[in-house]
Amino acid sequence: MKLKVYADRMSQPSRAVLIFCKVNEIQFDEILIYLANRQQLSPEFKDINPMGKVPAIVDGKLKLSESHAILIYLSSAYPSVVDHWYPTDLSKRARIHSVLDWHHTNLRPGAAGYVLNSVLGPALGLPLNPKAAAEAEQLLTKSLTTLDTFWLKGNAMFLLGSNQPSIADLSLVCELTQLQVLDDKDRLRLLSPHKNVEQWIENTRKATMPHFDEVHEVLFRAKDRCQKQREMATASKPGPQSKIIQFSTIGEKSDDPNLVQNTTDRRKHRRKWSRAEDAILISAWLNTSKDPIVDNEHKACAFWKRIGAYFNNSASLANLPKREPSHCKQRWSKLNDKVCKFVGCYDQALNQRSSGQSEDDVFQVAYQVYTNNYKSNFTLEHAWRELRHSKKWCSLYPFENSKGGGSSKRTKLNNGDRVYSSSSNPESVPIALDEEEQVMDLPLGVKSSKQKEKKVATIITIEEREADSGSRLENLWVLDEEEQVMDRPLGVKSLEQKENKVAPKPTIEEREAADSRSRLENLWALKEKEEREADSRSRLENLWALKEKDIEEQKKLTRMEVLKSLLGRTTDQLSEKEDILKNKLIDEML
């Protein structure tokens, strides 16, 4: 059976295994596992590697993970592998093992930790952490010094005084090439003091060409994207002598051809949205309409201007270029569409949930349903987790039609928005149309308050009329009794006593007025009870959502605090379990 290699080329250990197989002409099938799409957590891949990490291989009946173990196995199992990669000499093998063990506890935490906390954090939904980056940089600098003065001592081209590369050379070089995503000045600041290290990286690259550059092509493209984003961020902060090019439908024209060309180039460039930006956009959409609105004719264009202002004023995005309101609207439309579709898939998976299945298992089933239905991967899990418990979002985008098979038609939501429901896809969900044309609704509190005031005024008016009518009837009744007393003959005591014993019967108008008052009192009491219950339910739902979010944030902060404390200690101060925990936390961050 042909060897299968499960890898993601943005992963340093994955690149080492792929280059090794290609250089030694080992026939294999490469199966891509995209970490950004959480494919490593799928049930199919966890059957191969229960830890859910890449790389992993399947060779016949053997399923193996951990890049160092994979490289050792391939070197021993395949005759085409040249001896210098993993020598048969036991003393040389032992020294290679010592380098590999040192790599996992020194160079990898330093290099990976610095890149994560200074560049790649936002791409993974984590904030940049200058303090953690500084601590990782100290470990990286120390590791580079050890590499330069101990492992590369002498005039040899490779580690341990060898003139040919080993699996240790390949593994460590792939680790350091991850620094390519840094700014050029930052990378040179770290590597330039270590000339032996720079020459050794180049020697390993040449020894494994052309496969080295081919496997690293994904990383080089990521480097170019990071560099362009840094250039855009610099261009968005003009100095006192620079010229600002205005981008608007009514902007001023420029006679300078260079400015016109620069404007065209900047318009062509499209900056991708990070998870952190998505989180701020969702927060802006959820919170903006809660502000006081003084006019019922509040158009959607003004609404998106306010969302754009909310987004651009966020402190966590201060170092990034500003987004236009139209950009926010386009991103929200795309994000909302995909999340709505995934909700339908998740509901379907939830209905088919069997006993023993966890929430992660249900998510994986929903992910597979989405992939099968829409022929693409669902990459917005972070947005789905933010919106799924939002009362406002759920009320505006109901999902009763997501499982139906009715005809394709437009319907109306509670707020009057037009939606489109298609029968061609049983998992289709309603999507709001014509956002620019619709008039924004007033906040729920304002409308309900106005309706309540109108109802109270109506009830008070009815009660006042009934009270006035009852008062007039009582006055007429008293006058009638006085007239009867005046007309009675004197001395007729027996008749007078008989009439006093008989209670006066209410008129039809009195009975109707009393019944009306009773019904109104009952209706008003029932209405107040319903409002109290609804308000109580709303508060409980909000508290529960906040509690869940706080728990998740607390878990994340706890893991980061544990990792920071472990990174602040030297290897000699860590027990074996603490060392394993530190490496596991670093891998989770990446």
UniProtKB/Swiss-Prot annotation:
Gene3D superfamilies: 1.20.1050.10, Glutaredoxin, Homeodomain-like
Positions of the GST N-terminal domain: 1-82
Highest taxon listed in the record's lineage: Eukaryota
Annotated ranges, domain Myb-like: 265-336
InterPro entries, alphabetized: Glutathione-S-Trfase_C-like, Glutathione-S-Trfase_C_sf, Glutathione_S-Trfase_N, GST_C_Theta, GST_N_Theta, GSTT1/2/3, SANT/Myb, Thioredoxin-like_sf
Residues of the GST C-terminal domain: 89-232
Short name of one Pfam family: GST_N
Keywords: Detoxification, Nucleus, Transferase
EC number(s) reported in the record: 2.5.1.18
CDD domains with a match to the protein in the record: GST_C_Theta, GST_N_Theta
MF (Gene Ontology): glutathione transferase activity
Function of the molecule: May be involved in the conjugation of reduced glutathione to a wide number of exogenous and endogenous hydrophobic electrophiles and have a detoxification role against certain herbicides.
GO biological process: toxin catabolic process
EC top class named in words: transferase
Region (Disordered): 402-427
Name of the encoding gene: GSTT3
One cellular-component annotation, GO: nucleus
Family: Belongs to the GST superfamily. Theta family.
PANTHER family: GLUTATHIONE S-TRANSFERASE T1-RELATED (PTHR44750:SF1)
Protein localization: Nucleus
Protein's recorded name: Glutathione S-transferase T3
Provenance organism: Arabidopsis thaliana (Mouse-ear cress)
